[in-house]
Amino acid sequence: MTAPVPAPRILLPLLLLLLLTPPPGARGEVCMASRGLSLFPESCPDFCCGTCDDQYCCSDVLKKFVWSEERCAVPEASVPASVEPVEQLGSALRFRPGYNDPMSGFGATLAVGLTIFVLSVVTIIICFTCSCCCLYKTCRRPRPVVTTTTSTTVVHAPYPQPPSVPPSYPGPSYQGYHTMPPQPGMPAAPYPMQYPPPYPAQPMGPPAYHETLAGGAAAPYPASQPPYNPAYMDAPKAAL
């Protein structure tokens, strides 16, 4: 029996896979560095071309160079003694004190100084606003109040008394006499506390006539006298 012929549906994907397969070297190759120029290998996207001493990247398949230890073996005598291993060279570059940039040290010092200055200013501001800080208590301490004693002398002045009115006496008052009001600023005249004794009563008539006083020649005065009439008395003269 003959083998079955594969269907065209299976052949078409196989042809596509063969056509889409990348050419050799498309995934990239690692070229060994040239002697004396670089100590690290170089990755190329296409191929490595050149010789053992000088390799470079290229895309020409005809110039492709395949490196191998047997082909590019280097005798030990040709290796210079001054070349240091990669590990030692890296450690020397890493920890060598002269390799550091001087500007980096200046920047670090400047950053530390600015940080200390900002922290000092913030601390002072917090101390002046917080009641538990010593600077706040020192600035807010109450100042001693100096009290001055002033002595006040009180002078007891006599209370001004109203002018006293002289007491009126019994009997008829004199029409021509007018009481003078007290002058302002002048003390009133003191008056006795006791009233003066009353005037004796005026007799109803003149005294009786005695013959002994008139000498015997005088005529006898009638015993009966008319009653006393004040209208017959002279009117008092007004005081000037």
From Swiss-Prot:
Membrane topology field: Single-pass type I membrane protein
GO molecular function: WW domain binding
Ranges that cross the membrane: 106-126
Main location: endoplasmic reticulum
Leader sequence residues: 1-28
Pfam families attached to this UniProt entry: Shisa_N
Cytoplasmic compartment segments: 127-240
Description of what induces expression: Induced in a p53/TP53-dependent manner in response to cellular stress.
Gene Ontology CC, one term: endoplasmic reticulum
Extracellular-side positions: 29-105
Entry annotated with the keyword tRNA processing: no
Keyword ATP-binding (UniProt): no
Single GO biological process annotation from the record: positive regulation of canonical NF-kappaB signal transduction
Record's subcellular location: Endoplasmic reticulum membrane; Nucleus membrane
The entry's keywords: Apoptosis, Endoplasmic reticulum, Membrane, Nucleus, Signal, Transmembrane, Transmembrane helix
Subunit-structure text: Interacts with PDCD6; PDCD6 can stabilize SHISA5.
Stated role: Can induce apoptosis in a caspase-dependent manner and plays a role in p53/TP53-dependent apoptosis.
Domain notes: The proline-rich region is required for endoplasmic reticulum localization.
Family per record: Belongs to the shisa family.
UniProt protein name: Protein shisa-5
